[in-house]
């Protein structure tokens, strides 16, 4: 259904089975017989998800493992083939110091981590892993999904962070490492590369403004960029409050469609602040967030810094909600109060990351470090938390809530998407 009238190469794929291909299949073909066989040896091992590979890395206690997750799996999976490329101890040490400098790891972990990694992930160690046991075959709703994939941009040049559907129906995806975004027509598959101005770098997050333009955080440049989808013109302005010319690391942005001013709200992961930007005057207002001792429930952060991260607006009352990844907080800004009337709460898990507010006002938060997700009720200030399967090895980066209140969670550690129905409390993994 919906396919172009051409011949296709059809592949069958199921974890635990070897891939099988059938060539020259006409669109609309209904009856097709494909013989399958069990995957063995290397063809089975390559199906192992990162969460399983990460589970092979042993720690002395759950606290040490959590500390490692919070410091060494921010931007990539742990244990997959690309992660296992270092060969010698100095190569592993170079990689880890480049990523974190060991600054956030516990001292006793710093002293042992190179050996642990080599003993777990060097080639001959991998050969000694237990045989990978595939999960059961999908059933029910998980078998009804249709997933369409596109290879974005040039081969080996795609490092896409966020995407947004424009009012023209195109999908705009920002390539954080190449200073450009790709406009994809999901109907035809046509892609158009759009270069950002040469003086700004690292487009991170992208959102549609109330006038239909697209705003992007340029995290490495401390700037904000507006793209007019009708004229193709860019406008760039600083992300910090005057007189500063630039911010530290503008991160996630959101725009409330009910806001008559259309303010652009965003976090800055390199400071303890959130910001609002007027889309016409480009006036920036900084909201200095609370210190750790001022949070409801107090508690302690897990890593260095504070790291304001995810952000969203409430469709119920317009409040702005944000998370602090390393500070281990979520917070609320009242845009109608001159000082923001800022409040923060400590969640009962580690690593609140890119949150969203549901149509009913519930704040849904992924617990990146703990492998969970939960909701916070602003009225009762109570949490409800749900574990993902194999929670200790999962690293949910972000979630979203659709118009029906269904929660969709990134299975960052095992290449899945999870659908959670808050009414029935059922989780389906795709």
Residue ranges and their predicted role:
Residues 2-24:
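A short, solvent-exposed loop/turn motif at the edges and junctions
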Residues 134-158:
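A short helix->beta-strand "capping" segment at the edge of beta-propeller domains
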Residues 25-48:
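Extracellular beta-sheet/turn segments enriched in Thr/Pro/Gly and aliphatic residues
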Residues 155-168, 199-211, 242-262, 292-317, ...:
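Beta-rich, blade/repeat-based domains predominating
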Residues 68-79, 113:
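The canonical Cys-X-X-Cys-His
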Residues 101-133, 169-171, 264, 320, ...:
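C-terminal capping alpha-helices of c-type cytochrome domains
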Residues 185-189, 228-232, 278-282, 334-338, ...:
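Short loop/turn segments that connect beta-strands within beta-propeller blades
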Residues 171-177, 215-221, 257, 264-270, ...:
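Conserved beta-strand positions in repeat-built beta-propeller and related beta-rich domains
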């Amino acid at each position: 259904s919906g396919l172009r009238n051409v011949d296709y190469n059809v592949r069958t794929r199921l974890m635990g089975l070897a891939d099988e291909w059938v060539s020259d299949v006409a669109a609309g073909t209904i009856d097709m017989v494909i013989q399958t066989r069990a995957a063995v040896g290397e063809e089975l091992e390559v199906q192992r998800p990162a969460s399983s590979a990460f589970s092979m890395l042993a720690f002395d206690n759950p606290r040490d493992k959590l500390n490692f997750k919070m410091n060494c799996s921010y931007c990539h999976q742990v244990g997959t083939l690309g992660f296992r490329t270092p060969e010698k101890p100095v190569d592993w040490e170079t990689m880890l110091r480049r990523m974190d400098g060991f600054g956030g790891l516990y001292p006793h972990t710093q002293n042992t981590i190179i050996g642990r990694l080599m003993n777990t992930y060097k080639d001959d160690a991998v050969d000694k892993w237990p045989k990978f046991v595939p999960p059961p075959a999908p059933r029910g709703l998980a078998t009804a999904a249709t997933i369409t994939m596109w290879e974005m941009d040039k081969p080996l040049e795609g490092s896409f962070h966020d995407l947004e559907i424009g009012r023209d129906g195109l999908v705009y995806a920002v390539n954080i490492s190449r200073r450009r975004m790709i406009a994809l027509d999901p109907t035809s598959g046509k892609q158009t590369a759009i270069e950002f101005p040469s003086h700004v770098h690292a487009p991170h997050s992208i959102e549609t403004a109330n006038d239909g333009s697209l705003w992007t955080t340029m995290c490495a440049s401390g700037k904000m960029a507006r793209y007019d989808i009708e004229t193709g013109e860019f406008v760039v302005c600083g992300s910090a409050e005057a007189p500063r010319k630039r911010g530290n690391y503008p991160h996630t942005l959101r725009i409330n469609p009910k806001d008559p001013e259309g303010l652009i709200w965003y976090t800055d992961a390199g400071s303890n602040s959130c910001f609002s930007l007027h889309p016409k005057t480009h006036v920036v207002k900084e909201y200095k967030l609370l210190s750790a001792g001022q949070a409801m429930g107090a508690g302690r952060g897990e890593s260095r810094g504070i790291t304001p991260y995810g952000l969203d607006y409430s469709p119920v009352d317009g409040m702005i909600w944000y998370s602090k990844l390393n500070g281990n907080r979520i917070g609320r800004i009242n845009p109608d109060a001159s000082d923001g009337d800022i409040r923060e709460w400590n969640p009962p898990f580690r690593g609140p990351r890119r949150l969203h507010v549901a149509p009913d006002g519930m704040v849904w938060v992924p617990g990146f470090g703990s492998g969970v997700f939960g909701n916070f009720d602003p009225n009762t200030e109570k949490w409800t938390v749900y574990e993902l399967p194999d929670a200790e090895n999962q690293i949910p980066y972000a979630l979203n809530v659709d118009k029906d209140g269904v929660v969709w969670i990134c299975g960052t550690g095992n290449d899945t998407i999870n659908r959670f129905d808050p009414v029935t409390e059922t989780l389906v993994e795709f």
